[in-house]
Amino acid sequence: MYNLIVKKSVKKDIEDINRDDLQRIADNIRVLKFNPLPPGVKKIKKGKEFYYRLRQGNFRIGYRFDSTEKLIEIIYVRRRSERTYL
């Protein structure tokens, strides 16, 4: 099982999300703790680092993980738009 870190900026990202969507997002994040690469995850390269994006309806969950340290960092949760993608 992976440890989970959520960036402070994610709290701002989720302020305006309705309760039902927020519950589904939280469920997907819980799944990441056990499987950091579930079906449907897209690998994104930015510079020399790799990030991953998980789709949840109209929302995207951006994260990165370190398998050696068993750590997952949630970077953003955003409604799908042009600025969503890194």
Where are the predicted features?
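Enriched for short, Lys/Arg-rich terminal
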Residues: M1-I5, S9-K12, D16, D20-Q23, ...
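Residue-level recognition of specific faces of alpha-helices
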Residues: D13, N28, G40-K43, E73
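Compact soluble domain cores
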Residues: D21-K33
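A short, surface-exposed loop/turn module that caps and links secondary-structure elements
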Residues: R30-R53
